[in-house]
């Protein structure tokens, strides 16, 4: 109807749409991301939106180079549920001097470490009554493992030859490391020079490394999908339970290390942990070294040194012990410091704010808020409120209670005067006809 009655405005509206998409692509480069993934895997563009067809073709091309014929697809029953990732209940509240440590590409590295692949699985029989807790407490005698490695769900994988999945993921990961390094170098240069040309370089390098990251992480999802050619519940669960073991292993090890270092007993220094990260408070260490004379820059430099020279080597040693204990194909767990924050607040699982001064070696002149799961980053929160929540969080980090109360009261008055279209958001309502019609109301 619009097309027929007002052709000119219809055309103008569509031109505006095209311009907006072009601007979004110039900044986000999402189309470029899809194209990068499609060319990498030799798939159609639509296939990058899922993991099943994408990885089916990746594996086919990899095996074809080796003159290996892929198996026929089997009709699988509906996929059963299996164990997921581990997320620790956080220590709720505000904490000072927090550092986070992140495992690089956890699931792909678990595939490499345990040589997880359809053809390396040692039969469908599991080791009975095997759990993450038993391996954490070293209640399992693993000295009998010869030519196989053990995962916490009881699956065994051969270690005499490298599987096709570890080969593909290792190649992808090496490419990702290259482009992520280029992205971080460009980010640091931008922080120093503020040259706007660098923003496009950052976006381009980020998209290439993201293409690799998405491809790597989707391998595990494909294996657990009943429509995948190489679907195997035992293999998928081997990956997730091995991830649980890795993050809980290092949580226990770091707590023991810091309790010994600081002369405390059973104090929990790990504030929170999720699939591939741990968040640790170093407040006691900072107070012990600096006392009341606390210079922010000196403390950040000190914590950076502690992370690289003490914590990371200890983590490497701990993960080497784990790899030896389960007779892994190789030790691929690589955990590095991500964030240094002077303050962090947790409200629940995966809901936190960090006042970050340094992220992955990129030092900020002014601290940046790293927000996860808080209303300030939720699209369902009205835009004016999202910005004000962020402003309020900055006051929480650097101001006092009086400043915060004043800010809230001022915005309360401002909010009441805002037009409804600025603070409303679309939501559907069910059953309007049922509850408003004369026949159905009573």
What role is predicted for each listed range?
Residues 1, 59, 111, 159, ...:
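Short, Φ-rich (hydrophobic/aromatic) sequence segments
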Residues 2-118, 124, 196-253, 272, ...:
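Common nucleic-acid-contacting/processivity interface regions adjacent to the catalytic cores
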Residues 19-20, 24-37, 68-72, 112, ...:
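Intrinsically disordered or highly flexible coil/loop and linker segments, enriched in small
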Residues 86-88, 265-270, 323:
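Catalytic micro-motifs at enzyme active sites that drive phosphoryl/nucleotidyl and oxygen chemistry
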Residues 118-167, 298-323:
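Charge-dense polyanion-binding interfaces
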Residues 247-275:
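Active-site palm subdomain of RNA-directed nucleic acid polymerases
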Residues 279-442:
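C-terminal polymerase-core module
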């Amino acid at each position: 109807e619009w097309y027929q009655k007002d052709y000119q405005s219809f055309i103008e509206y569509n031109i505006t749409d095209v311009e907006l998409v072009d601007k979004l692509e110039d900044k986000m480069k999402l189309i470029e991301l899809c194209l990068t993934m499609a060319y990498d895997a030799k798939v159609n563009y639509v296939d990058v939106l899922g993991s099943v067809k994408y990885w089916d073709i990746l594996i086919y091309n990899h095996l074809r180079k080796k003159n290996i014929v892929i198996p026929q697809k089997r009709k699988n029953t509906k996929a059963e549920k299996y164990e997921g990732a581990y997320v620790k209940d956080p220590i709720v509240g505000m904490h000072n001097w927090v550092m986070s440590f992140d495992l690089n590409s956890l699931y792909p590295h678990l595939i490499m470490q345990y040589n997880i692949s359809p053809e390396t699985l040692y039969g469908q029989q599991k080791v009975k009554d095997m759990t993450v807790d038993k391996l954490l407490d070293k209640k399992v005698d693993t000295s009998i493992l010869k030519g196989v490695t053990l995962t916490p769900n009881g699956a065994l994988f051969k270690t005499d030859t490298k599987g096709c999945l570890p080969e593909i993921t290792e190649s992808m990961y090496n490419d990702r490391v290259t482009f992520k390094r280029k992205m971080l170098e460009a980010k640091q240069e931008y922080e120093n020079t503020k040259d706007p040309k660098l923003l496009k370089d950052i976006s381009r390098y980020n998209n290439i490394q993201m293409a690799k990251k998405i491809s790597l992480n989707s391998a595990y999802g494909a294996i657990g999908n009943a429509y995948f050619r190489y679907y195997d519940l035992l293999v998928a669960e081997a990956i997730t339970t091995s991830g649980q073991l890795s993050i809980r292993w290092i949580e226990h090890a770091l707590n023991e290390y810091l309790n010994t270092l600081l002369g405390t007993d059973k104090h929990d220094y790990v504030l929170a942990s999720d699939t591939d990260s741990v968040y640790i408070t170093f407040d006691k260490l900072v107070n012990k070294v600096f006392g009341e004379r606390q210079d922010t820059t000196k403390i950040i430099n000190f914590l950076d040194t502690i992370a690289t020279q003490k914590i990371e080597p200890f983590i490497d040693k701990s993960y080497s012990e784990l790899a030896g204990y389960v007779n892994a194909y190789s030790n691929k767990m690589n955990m590095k410091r991500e964030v240094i924050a002077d303050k962090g607040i947790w409200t629940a699982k995966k809901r936190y704010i960090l006042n970050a001064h340094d992220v992955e070696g990129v030092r900020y002149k002014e601290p940046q808020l790293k927000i996860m799961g808080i209303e300030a980053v939720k699209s369902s929160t009205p835009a004016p409120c999202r910005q004000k929540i962020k402003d309020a969080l900055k006051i929480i980090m650097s101001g006092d209670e009086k400043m915060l109360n004043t800010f809230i009261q001022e915005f309360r008055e401002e909010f009441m005067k805002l037009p409804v279209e600025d603070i409303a958001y679309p939501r559907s309502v069910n059953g309007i006809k049922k509850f408003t019609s004369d026949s159905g109301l009573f």
